[in-house]
């Protein structure tokens, strides 16, 4: 699994570096690259490749999808780390973008990464049917704005030190994390003509995203900052509404196992073609950073 992740990281980073190299250079490109590279494990990109394998989608198309997703993800991390949000100093084992370059520069770098995602998907060299292209841009827009990441982050901040129901926490985590995972699982399907698979993989993606968020919360609960590459135990200090704070550590693990079983049951009909996707899901649960 580690070799497959490294391969994904290298391929996506190469695409993004080449894409940026062809653009007119600006002073803002330095903090943009700082927030984007080397990046994390590229789990979202790996899911795109995994689902692409199920439906036999060419890698050259998957690279556009994954690069756009990583731009969105990096933008969200830069903004999440800001003092007015989660106020973090360390991300991916190094200073957060605002600590390195200042708050205003970090905001602008994050904004630029958000728009870069749309630039990549609308690029004429991403040579797909225009209706499919519009569907992808529409979907990633929903995943990033008030119906997705931004809306989820708003709720995350708003729920601090409050009693919140399990369903509200789940809805918040699906917005904050699950929607972009849903795009990762759904976008390769959109490139095919298998419309009957769209709803199914949208739900699978949301569930994987929820699984990822639970795993992330478990890392915050039990790991060290050195291992995780970011501050840990910050959720409890800030009174964050998480499934761990609501259900307890053991019950959160049980809920994650239930989710995994549901996802695996949904993949039964795809045989060996879904083996990479299942392996990635197992990795999401077992990771320590």
Give the role of each language-model region:
Residues 1, 288-289:
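C-terminal end-of-chain micro-motif
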């Amino acid at each position: 699994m580690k070799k497959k992740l490294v391969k994904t990281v290298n391929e996506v980073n190469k695409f993004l570096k080449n894409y940026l190299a062809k653009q007119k250079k600006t002073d803002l490109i330095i903090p943009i690259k700082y927030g984007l590279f080397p990046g994390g494990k590229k789990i979202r990109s790996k899911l795109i490749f995994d689902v692409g394998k199920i439906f036999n989608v060419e890698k050259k198309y998957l690279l556009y999808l994954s690069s756009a997703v990583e731009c969105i993800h990096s933008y969200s991390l830069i903004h999440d780390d800001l003092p007015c949000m989660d106020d973090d100093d360390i991300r991916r084992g190094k200073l957060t973008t605002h600590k390195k370059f200042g708050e205003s520069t970090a905001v602008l770098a994050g904004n630029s990464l958000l728009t870069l995602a749309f630039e990549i998907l609308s690029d004429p060299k991403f040579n797909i049917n225009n209706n499919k292209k519009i569907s992808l841009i529409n979907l990633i827009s929903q995943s990033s704005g008030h119906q997705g990441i931004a809306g989820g982050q708003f709720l995350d901040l708003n729920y601090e030190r409050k009693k919140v129901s399990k369903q509200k926490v789940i809805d918040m985590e699906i917005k904050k994390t699950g929607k972009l995972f849903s795009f990762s699982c759904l976008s390769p399907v959109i490139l095919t003509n298998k419309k009957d698979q769209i709803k199914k993989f949208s739900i699978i993606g949301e569930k994987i995203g929820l699984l990822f968020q639970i795993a992330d919360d478990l890392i915050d609960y039990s790991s060290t900052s050195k291992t995780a590459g970011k501050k840990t135990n910050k959720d409890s200090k800030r009174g964050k509404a998480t499934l761990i704070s609501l259900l307890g550590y053991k019950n959160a693990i049980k809920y994650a196992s239930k989710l995994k079983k549901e996802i695996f049951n949904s993949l039964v009909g795809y045989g060996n073609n879904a083996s990479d996707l299942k392996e990635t899901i197992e990795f999401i649960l077992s990771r320590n950073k």
